[in-house]
């Protein structure tokens, strides 16, 4: 039986863990790629993927739920105007977790978390140069 195997504690209290995952999800929504430890990346996936699924259907109730989870209006706007339409046809699996070696100080396994189908950096740089 798998009772009680819900989530990783990550050596934090529940409020600290909630705040950390909220900050990490906001950073991921802003930059679309972040570097963190592997266990944090796996927990982050359980927070961000339902958020993007909320963003696929734009209504007031979903916007309020997303605001309750991110506490930032700018990210809610980006979630429903950019990310929701981008992943409208994809049935889940919005994040890619790539193993990224080990941290020098404590040898912790690191991971690169990125949104799938994100615009390439070269395309964004080319558009910025034209403007």
Swiss-Prot record:
Pfam families found in the cross-reference section: Ribosomal_L17 (PF01196)
GO biological process: translation
Subunit structure: Part of the 50S ribosomal subunit. Contacts protein L32.
Species this chain originates from: Polynucleobacter necessarius subsp. necessarius (strain STIR1)
PANTHER family, A to Z: LARGE RIBOSOMAL SUBUNIT PROTEIN BL17M, RIBOSOMAL PROTEIN L17
Protein name: Large ribosomal subunit protein bL17
Spans through the membrane: none
Domain of life: Bacteria
Residue ranges of coiled coil: none
Keywords annotated in UniProt: Ribonucleoprotein, Ribosomal protein
Classification via NCBIfam families: L17
The keyword Ribonucleoprotein appears for this protein: yes
């Amino acid at each position: 039986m798998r009772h009680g195997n819900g989530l990783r504690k990550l050596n934090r209290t529940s409020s600290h863990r909630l705040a950390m995952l909220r900050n990490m999800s906001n950073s991921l929504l802003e930059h679309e790629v972040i570097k963190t430890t592997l266990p944090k990346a796996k927990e982050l996936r359980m927070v961000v993927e339902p958020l993007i699924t909320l963003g696929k259907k734009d209504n007031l109730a979903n916007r309020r739920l997303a605001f309750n989870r991110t506490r930032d209006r700018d990210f809610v706007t980006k979630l429903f105007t950019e990310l929701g339409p981008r992943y409208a046809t994809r049935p889940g699996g919005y994040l890619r977790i790539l193993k990224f070696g080990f941290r020098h100080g404590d040898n912790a396994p690191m991971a690169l978390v990125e949104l799938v189908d994100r615009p390439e950096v070269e395309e964004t740089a080319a558009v910025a140069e034209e403007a």
